[in-house]
From Swiss-Prot:
Residues engaged in binding ATP: 26, 29, 110, 153, 156, 159, 162
One GO biological process term: tRNA 3'-terminal CCA addition
GO terms, molecular function: ATP binding; CCA tRNA nucleotidyltransferase activity; magnesium ion binding; tRNA binding
Cofactor: Mg(2+)
Protein EC: 2.7.7.72
Residues bound to CTP: 26, 29, 110, 153, 156, 159, 162
UniProt organism field: Bacillus cereus (strain ZK / E33L)
Protein name: CCA-adding enzyme
């Protein structure tokens, strides 16, 4: 409760001004489950302009949705006005938002009962939709009729399966049936929003369970490049996903499991950044080399420690080894390298030009590369004079 205590002054101030205010959403859910608390959100009967008038230190981030960030005790908190939503457009967003003074109306519009629990600053819970019962049963249940919730915002189906992966809960029967029925509506949702949820699924503690639900509900068939991947997705559930430390590793392993032959095309379709695509593809290419041979100094040097560590964890998962010392071995090998990058070489292109008395040309870059590999392989010490002598001995000058 310590983090809630730090934010309770916001609720107390709002109440002193005649408004209702409560902690809501995922933080209350995680407190009940005894999980680490993420962002703490507050819902209030105060209108956005009233919130801004009460708290001088604020950021008006989403006024059209009633959200104001209030900075209290050096921490930012989202304070959102109770609201209800009209008919949804395109199965993804309400055509309009109406601010209301009723907590019940606000909680009624939320996706799942476990996320529709409010809490006072004293810790008293307001649970109008049996969210605590669902948490006790470890079930994911929609607020109201599942068909209505998913037709309002089809992304909720993906969120439901993401919660299976992150919490280890199961989809309640009617909720699961509704996903099977309305899964096609996910095709109306922007891929960027789906990617966010899918990544949380892949990095969840119960990822295998989430992937199984993705297959059982057939929701996968409405995702880009996964329409024909049922058997491959089931293959992914046969592995242990516990060893990964980054989302890059999870995506690389997922692409390996589904046998994706053109990973960069897949990732662009899912709207990844160029940097992320580059890292994921680098991990996959490194694994391909790693399958052919064990690490040597040249492969490790060219790969770099960041990609090498991730590739090794994915490789261990692929061969179902789970030797936790393998990454440590890679780290030890890397630390033993004479140089970690070209910038550490004790010679430059200018040195070569002076020594050879030749005009600049492609030969300079080629020579630098030869010297670089010789240093990494231990054939020459990384000292200017030693390198010059080695070049002369090899008739390269």
């Amino acid at each position: 409760m310590e983090r809630f205590k730090k934010a309770s002054s916001i609720i107390e101030t709002l109440k002193q001004q005649g408004h209702e205010a409560y902690f809501v959403g995922g933080s209350v859910r995680d407190l009940i489950i005894d999980r680490p608390i993420g962002d703490i959100d507050i819902a209030t009967s105060a209108l956005p302009e009233e919130v801004m008038a009460i708290f001088p230190r604020h950021v008006p981030v989403g006024l059209e949705h009633g959200t104001v960030i209030v900075v209290e005790n050096g921490e930012p908190y989202e304070v959102t006005t109770f609201r209800t939503e009209s008919e949804y457009e395109d199965f993804r967003r309400p055509s309009s938002v109406q601010f209301v003074r009723s907590l019940e109306e606000d909680l009624k519009r939320r996706d799942f009962t476990m996320n529709a629990i409010a809490m006072t600053e004293e810790g008293e819970r307001i649970d109008l939709f049996a969210g605590q019962e669902a948490i006790q049963k470890r079930e994911i249940v929609t607020v109201g009729t599942a068909a209505d919730r998913f037709q309002e915002d089809a992304l909720r189906m993906m969120r439901g399966i993401r919660f299976v992966s992150t919490l280890g809960f199961s989809l309640e029967t009617k909720t699961k049936q509704a996903i099977e029925t309305y899964g096609h509506l996910l095709e109306h949702i922007a891929i960027e929003r789906i990617t966010v949820e899918f990544e949380k699924l892949l990095t969840g503690t119960y990822c295998v369970k989430g992937l199984k639900e993705l297959v059982e509900t057939k929701l996968f068939s409405h995702l880009p490049y996964l329409q024909m991947s049922e058997e491959r997705l089931l293959k992914a559930t046969q592995y242990n996903w516990d060893s990964f430390e980054t989302d890059i590793e999870a995506w690389a392993f997922f692409l390996y499991c589904i046998g994706e032959e053109h990973p960069s095309v897949f990732l662009r379709q899912w709207k990844f950044s160029n940097k992320k695509i580059k890292d994921i593809v680098a991990v996959l290419l490194t694994i391909r080399k790693r399958k052919e041979k064990d690490w040597d100094t040249v492969l490790l040097y060219k790969t770099g420690i960041h990609i090498a560590e991730m590739a090794e964890r994915v490789y261990e998962a692929m061969i179902e080894s789970y030797d936790h010392t393998s990454v440590e071995r890679v780290q030890t090998l890397f630390q033993a390298l004479p140089i970690k990058s070209r910038q550490e070489m004790d010679v430059t292109g200018n040195d070569l030009l002076n020594w050879a008395s030749k005009k600049p040309g492609p030969w300079v870059a080629e020579m630098i590369q030869k010297i670089e590999e010789a240093i990494v392989q231990g054939n020459v010490v990384n000292e200017k004079e030693c390198i010059r002598e080695w070049l002369q001995e090899c008739n390269l000058l």
